[in-house]
Amino acid sequence: KSITKSEEVLDNYLDKQDGVYEVKENTDGDLEVTAPYQTKRLIVESDQVKDTCGASEVYVNEMDHETILQYDSEEKTEEAFQQLSRTYSSCYPDKVVSIEDSTMGLPLSQGGENGQGTYSWGSDYMGLNELKKQAASSGYTRRVTVAVVDTGIDTSNVLFAGRKVSSQSYNFFGNNHNVQDTFGHGTHVSGIIADATPANVELLVLRVSNNEGKSSLLTIKTALQYAVSKNADVVNLSMGFIDVNASLYDYLDSTIDKAYNRGIPICCAAGNGEGGSKGVDV
């Protein structure tokens, strides 16, 4: 297709910036800019990569038969991708995942209990207060662990009073056990779960984002694997990908299948990207 004047101007501008950018026209006729190599990381679904094309760090995951390659610049990442993708059909850049901020500024408690034993209108609307009563009257006290793969948690919120947060909670972005939420989305999601469930439901909080709510495909998969290894009963994901393709779905599918085969359901967001978003809910 011929390049429009707007695309030419944008391309010329981006050529002067650091990094590697791609300009595409979407179905609405708007120009979209993506940075496909911004993580400076490639995922190759093979544990037999002979030539890493100058990677500064190499991690071979023999269990999942994959090699993770880290580079020093986006330009080097692009060059390596062009070369490696000719040899390995399943080779792709690690993608950025956006944890939507549509809940920012919304109060979790909505001003206090609504008289139905819950704080959020959603729990009330779905009758989850009745479910909590049934669970309490049944005498079912076995601990149920829900892994929340998100931005962390602020346990000072009233919804978490008396709620157990697992000591095995982990921050995959900081590589430590500090899962304090600095973005807000994870607290909102965990708050809904706490509001809608009885006290025997424990939260395994897995922080996978930076302070701006950005994560990556590899980080998400690592957190999912961790949740499965810690025998979580349920896993919750509420986030969206930008510029997805079938190979990215396949990459997560292998881990999701392992969870499924162990009887661990994974709950995903619907409508998390809102009406005008170009992202795809996960």
Protein language model regions, located:
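Autoinhibitory N-terminal propeptides
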Residues: 1-48, 89-103, 126-127
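Active-site core segment of subtilase-fold serine proteases
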Residues: 111-202, 222, 229-230, 234, ...
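Extracytoplasmic/secreted envelope proteins and their assembly/folding machinery
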Residues: 78-81, 186, 190, 221-224, ...
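Protease zymogen maturation seam
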Residues: 31-35, 58, 62-66, 75, ...
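Substrate-binding/access-modulating region of protease and related hydrolase catalytic domains
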Residues: 140, 208-282
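Helix N-cap motif at beta-to-alpha junctions
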Residues: 48, 71-78
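Active-site-proximal beta-strand/loop segments in catalytic clefts of secreted hydrolases
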Residues: 45-47, 94-96, 148-152, 195, ...
